[in-house]
Amino acid sequence: MIELTKKITDTVALEKIDPARLKTLSLPLDARIKSRQKVQLTSGEGVGLFLERGTLLRGGDVLTNADGVLVKVLAANETVSTIVCSDALMLTKVAYHLGNRHVPLQIETGFVRYQHDHVLDDMVRQLPGADTCVDVQVEQAPFEPEAGAYQQGGGHSHGHAHSHSHEKPHSHTHNH
């Protein structure tokens, strides 16, 4: 079994790759957020992913190993809800309400997309003003959500931790 251990991030190195050398791996988002797993190339050949923890794979990424095997990642089609709206303000409101529910979103000109959830579809349809322009389409399409403000590669992460205190500010200086 081929073991893939590294995502190539050097843009110069990526530009030098002969596309004919690339094998392909098609994965939905839920698989592209796992750094250690067994998967199959589109050719059917089994491979193991042993990537740095927290690595998010995006369509177009190239993986390699010590033997120089090159594998291009494709974002697989999966069941998604695509919200299409010609009114930019209404589409912004849709994105706001979905974001308030911490739903990973793919945001593009004219549409937003999320992993299909009929409850969220109904919520979007019931937003004030949605009946005038919002079209909820359940379809098979690649899903590439926004990375988020605190994430380098995107996806879902719990690596950033911080604490909050509700104590009143006070001085730590003492006069002795």
UniProtKB/Swiss-Prot annotation:
A GO BP annotation:
urea metabolic process
Cellular component annotations (GO), alphabetically ordered: cytoplasm
Specify where the region named Disordered lies, as residue ranges: 147-176
User: Quick check: keyword Chaperone in the entry?
Assistant: yes
Q: Which SMART domains match?
A: UreE_N (SM00988)
Pfam (any one): UreE_C
Q: Which UniProt keywords apply?
A: Chaperone, Cytoplasm, Nickel, Nickel insertion
Instruction: Give compartment(s).
Output: Cytoplasm
Among the GO molecular function terms of this UniProt record, one is: nickel cation binding
| Entry superkingdom | Bacteria
Q: Which HAMAP family is this protein grouped with?
A: UreE
Query: What is the recorded function of this protein according to its Swiss-Prot or TrEMBL entry?
Result: Involved in urease metallocenter assembly. Binds nickel. Probably functions as a nickel donor during metallocenter assembly.
In the record, the note on similarity to other proteins reads:
Belongs to the UreE family.
Q: What name does this protein carry?
A: Urease accessory protein UreE
The species is Alcanivorax borkumensis (strain ATCC 700651 / DSM 11573 / NCIMB 13689 / SK2)
Give the gene name. ureE
